[in-house]
């Protein structure tokens, strides 16, 4: 097959040997070895670094100018018209210059520190886990993500008794929260320093329409929704892989992430984060950690996909409940602690934020419930009192 494709492109085009790992070819740039026409008879070899998927982009391989590039969106400072807002200082402008993500601390059980271009955090107090599967906890930081970027939280917890789920942060004012999944039916105490992780901000990328297959248009934050097509029934303690009728064509330097939505915290479901490979159908692994059968109704948004110009990788971990972790690259955009920032002044307190979020969840559950509660059998037995 490769010989036939090579003959159709150019008899002087030779493909390098494929890597051993079947995932490595998506994360490392393949090398195209071409002979220069103006070279002597002995032939001088030119190594051209081209990230080309031969299955979809074979007709563009001979074009040396073919490259899907990404340009950073115009910074908010350039869009901010100072003439229309005279008398305002730099602290009241939408974003500081150079482009950095402003953030401020809030009272919580976590310590947040700036580490290079990431925010590192760990718990300073004991976190009590009740019999409820997922317990949302504020990370004690608020940040403003500029338009055209997204944030994501990563955790380095290797305990087999609980798992912390990553979260995608949309652009705008965000207050990240920690979702701790209790994998036992008993109370647990998480000691200080056990939960640690990072927050990074990366640029979004929207592929061309011809590069996407069966994907709905993205929302205003450049996130793509993945919905179920039929009713899914997951038994207690069972794991099921859900595939979506969607795919995308490989573009040079592009990576796609799939992360489950937070609304599933009420149904004891764990959606494993996935790196979506090009040329493959989108899919996620759903784990039912409850003792009851859960039914997911059709046309339910199960996960969100986002494209970026930074490449993420897997790290297999045997002691991790999910068996693997997603390792983020080093972000190019850093953070700056500016609690006096005008946009950060609108951040509500953690208590008020939890109340508002609960009310929003109740309203959104009426409009679009991720789990059909009429088909779900919940454990309604008596529960012991929750520890403070």
Swiss-Prot record:
Phylogenetic lineage: Viruses, Duplodnaviria, Heunggongvirae, Peploviricota, Herviviricetes
EC number assigned by the record: 3.6.1.23
InterPro entries: dUTPase-like_sf, Herpes_Orf11, HSV_DUT
Biological process according to GO: dUMP biosynthetic process; dUTP metabolic process
Family classification: Belongs to the dUTPase family.
Basic and acidic residues composition bias: residue spans: 77-88
Entry protein name: Deoxyuridine 5'-triphosphate nucleotidohydrolase
Biased composition (Acidic residues): 351-363
Function, in words: Involved in nucleotide metabolism: produces dUMP, the immediate precursor of thymidine nucleotides and decreases the intracellular concentration of dUTP to avoid uracil incorporation into viral DNA.
Region (Disordered): 77-96, 336-388
Cofactor (UniProt): Mg(2+)
SUPFAM superfamilies according to UniProt: dUTPase-like
Catalysis performed (reactions): dUTP + H2O = dUMP + diphosphate + H(+)
HAMAP family in the record: HSV_DUT
GO MF annotation, one: metal ion binding
Top-rank lineage group of the source organism: Viruses
Keywords (A to Z) from UniProt: Hydrolase, Magnesium, Metal-binding, Nucleotide metabolism
Primary gene name: DUT
Pathway it works in: Pyrimidine metabolism; dUMP biosynthesis; dUMP from dCTP (dUTP route): step 2/2
